[in-house]
């Protein structure tokens, strides 16, 4: 890859990528295309930065839900949601409380919305007490499995600047191990 323009919410620069799979004879047997972007995100000296520049989060939570169709959210509704967010100067959306349909990330990449991608780890009833699932070693595998599925599926969307390990899970060994796993993959 040569010189590229970095992706950001202000300038969502995307590039076309094409992958060609060839057999042993050199014949193309499969072609896959995708839009990709290039950016960095980090927390440095207590400040979130994208491409080395400070970012102020102006965000909302979004559930994949429609008042008329329930958990089925059409592409048209997703596009309407994006437009409403942009019209209201929103620059970040959290996928509450589970990873969203991949089309949502494609829209965020295209229109320039930062994403906090949230794994479907949740344990409201147990929260932060001694009985929290996050403190029970028997649940480490489940926490890590859900986080890994999210990261592996969504790792190539430049709009994702933060991985959320879950919602109201409490703290404990399960969250610590999931954090280490995600950090080892995307540091």
Predicted regions mapped to residue ranges:
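Secreted/periplasmic carbohydrate-active enzymes, especially glycoside hydrolases
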Residues: 1-107, 111-115, 146, 161-162, ...
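Aromatic- and acidic-residue-enriched carbohydrate-binding clefts of CAZyme catalytic domains
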Residues: 58-63, 71, 118-155
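Conserved short-loop catalytic and cofactor-binding motifs
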Residues: 66, 96, 131, 135, ...
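Solvent-exposed loop/turn segments at secondary-structure junctions
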Residues: 99-101, 121-123, 167-171
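Active-site neighborhood of glycoside hydrolase catalytic domains
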Residues: 110, 134-187
